[in-house]
A protein has these predicted regions:
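Short coil/turn segments at secondary-structure boundaries
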Residues: 52, 148-151, 187-192
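Residues embedded in well-ordered beta-strands within globular domains across many folds
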Residues: 26-28, 69, 146-149, 177
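N-terminal glycine-/serine-/threonine-rich beta1-alpha1-beta2 phosphate-ribose binding loop
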Residues: 1-93, 99-117
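Redox-cofactor-proximal catalytic regions of oxidoreductases
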Residues: 19, 125-126, 183-185
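Glycine-rich, aromatic-lined ligand/substrate-binding cores of catalytic
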Residues: 169-193
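A contiguous active-site-proximal alpha/beta segment in oxidoreductase catalytic domains
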Residues: 90-92, 97-175
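Short, small-residue-rich loop/turn micro-motifs
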Residues: 6, 31, 152, 180, ...
Length: 193
């Protein structure tokens, strides 16, 4: 199961759906507007449509799932990861794996206690092009390398300063806030763009 249907989660949905060793059975997202696109992306790659839910806890409780992918906003990485490991599921979680050191320590404790695998994703370090570049540097072909710098530019433009607004229909904003301080809804805090 995948928790999240936009941003990094959408990209992860694509990757796992193309993997012959994985099947995305259910996608959870508390914004119902994001689910149709995620389902379609998975269907095109995997040939079957995943179920959807607005509450990630349904994935935690589903005994047919053996692993959970956590592609939520940063402040929601640790809690579902810990819950999944307690429920006997392995976890792939996006970076950062936790919002603070205490959450990180609790994740490690859950992983050890329940003997689960918990991997934090770091897609740029894991890509073929980065691995190829690193292998080339290690050959010594460039001489002794003391520092390497890289950057990535995005041409999406400025996000602006939208005013706070009403929560979109169907969105469980209280759940989205979770343990974070409750603030008025703002599209830049919620989805960015």
């Amino acid at each position: 199961g995948v928790i999240g249907a936009g941003g990094r989660a959408l990209s992860l949905n694509r990757s796992f759906a193309e993997n012959a060793n994985a099947e995305i059975v259910t996608i959870a997202d508390l914004d119902p507007r994001r689910l149709p696109r995620a389902v379609e992306e998975v269907y095109r790659r995997q040939g079957s449509k995943p179920k959807t839910t607005g509450d990630f806890r349904h994935l935690i409780d589903d005994n047919s799932l053996d692993a959970i992918v956590v592609g939520t906003p940063d402040h929601w990485h640790a809690i579902p990861s810990i819950m999944a490991m307690i429920a006997g599921k392995d976890v792939y979680v996006e970076k950062p794996d936790s919002h603070n050191i205490v959450e990180g320590m609790r994740m490690v404790a859950a992983m050890k206690k329940h003997k689960r695998i918990c991997q934090m994703g770091s897609q740029h370090r894991s890509t073929t092009r980065m691995q190829t570049a690193l292998a080339y540097i290690k050959t010594g072909a460039l001489g002794r390398c003391l520092v390497a710098k890289a950057w990535e530019s995005s041409r999406q433009g400025a996000i602006g300063f939208p005013k706070d607004s009403q929560v979109p229909a169907g969105v469980n904003y209280d759940m989205w806030c979770g343990a974070a301080p409750k603030r008025p809804f703002n599209v830049n805090r919620f989805h960015g763009r």
